[in-house]
Amino acid sequence: MTSATPTSLTHPLVKLGLWLRDSGYRFVTPTPLTHARVNARDALEARNLRDIFGWSRPFKETLLPAPALIWLEQAGLLDHSGGLLASKVRFSSLGDQLYAHSAYPTTDADSVFFGPDTYRFANLIENEMAAQPLLPGARILDIGCGAGPGGISAALATIGSPHLTLADINPTALIFAQANVALAGMDGTCANSINS
């Protein structure tokens, strides 16, 4: 188990997420089919932050400030191809939070998904928590957490400071979840559910 405080891989993700939030970045992630259609009809090269971190389009190095490029490199999430760069992380808005997850297309075996089902799941959690709130000091365990929006949504809807544990067998998911807990300004634990 690891604390959800930023580590060498998550720290640059947290910095990037905070910078995006301060820049006013917002992106609601559509279905993969919608994503493919939009990218097929619009210019393929990114022109702004939403194109880079939402639509997962390749971009010229000059489109991002040096610190953002450094954070992507430090996290191992920057691709160089054909004279353009591509982010291997995408950031999506859910309520007032930003969540880091895998860039489109999510075809790798360790891809961390986020999309319309995530929004429905978070909405269900918020409605259930409003109908039957947890007591202060509650423990929240999100198994198969992915990027962590379920557990984080439950913790944000809980009065007081619940103990949050996010578990997943995918190490990439735990990196994103750890960064997302920190981005939400929360304390929590991330665990590989096989070894913990």
Regions picked out by a protein language model, each given a short descriptive name:
Residues L85-A130:
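Class I SAM-dependent transferase core
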Residues D117-S196:
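Conserved SAM/SAH cofactor-binding pocket of Class I
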Residues D51-W55, Y104-A109, T158-L164:
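Short, Lys/Arg-enriched charge-dense amphipathic segments
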Residues T2-D96:
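N-terminal auxiliary segments of SAM/dcSAM-dependent transferases
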Residues D22, D42, D51, D79, ...:
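Acidic-enriched, low-complexity/disordered segments with a strong bias for Aspartate over Glutamate
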